[in-house]
Amino acid sequence: RHRLGDDTRRWVPKHKKPLRDFFRHDLPWQTMQPIWKKEFVKQLGGFDEGFARHQDVELHTRALMLPSVRVEQFPGPIDCYYRVGEERRSDGIARRSEKLVDATLHYYERFMPDADRLGMRSALVGTLHRIQLQLLYHGREEQISRAELTQLEKRLFPKEIWRSIPLWKRFLFRVSR
């Protein structure tokens, strides 16, 4: 958007299970909203710069998996704003979507063992669906071509991942189209 506060979307932290929500890519907060102690972030090893995107999501996910982490949320009036710089938009929707798919797969593969261990595989599969919906939106808005959409979906759901998703969820992914 163009002016401070002209976007109606809000990040109001009121999630009961933030780890599950991060796995589903239903992000409970934006990078600048949590307050972590410096020692805690150092203990985590900081951001994983191996992630081209989702570095913040990856950091918060690792933090929330620690049994000792304590999270409190304080919904209230807006106290911060953020914007996406135009330089991040210069690639075009198709290229940004490719990067998003790659980062999503990196996140999915990185956290699948943890999601399995915690009984949250289904939530992590939700992150794929969330990204698929974004791709479908770009396709419907004709921001990407039908061919680009098809390629991006194939990239998002390689055969080994597609086969690991329960049949009923695969059905839902197809119905979403």
Place the predicted regions along the sequence by residue.
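Hydrophobic alpha-helical core bundles mediating ligand binding, dimerization, or RNAP-core interactions
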Residues: 57-60, 108, 128
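Amphipathic alpha-helical protein-interaction segments enriched in hydrophobic
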Residues: 120-136
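Conserved nucleotide-sugar donor-binding catalytic segment
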Residues: 3-99
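Generic macromolecular interface patches on structured domains
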Residues: 70, 114, 118-121, 163
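Catalytic core of nucleotide-sugar-dependent glycosyltransferases
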Residues: 76-86, 91-119, 141-158
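Membrane-interface aromatic/basic loop that binds lipid-linked glycans or pyrophosphate carriers
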Residues: 133-177
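Alpha-helix C-capping/helix-to-loop hinge sites
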Residues: 44-47, 114-118, 134
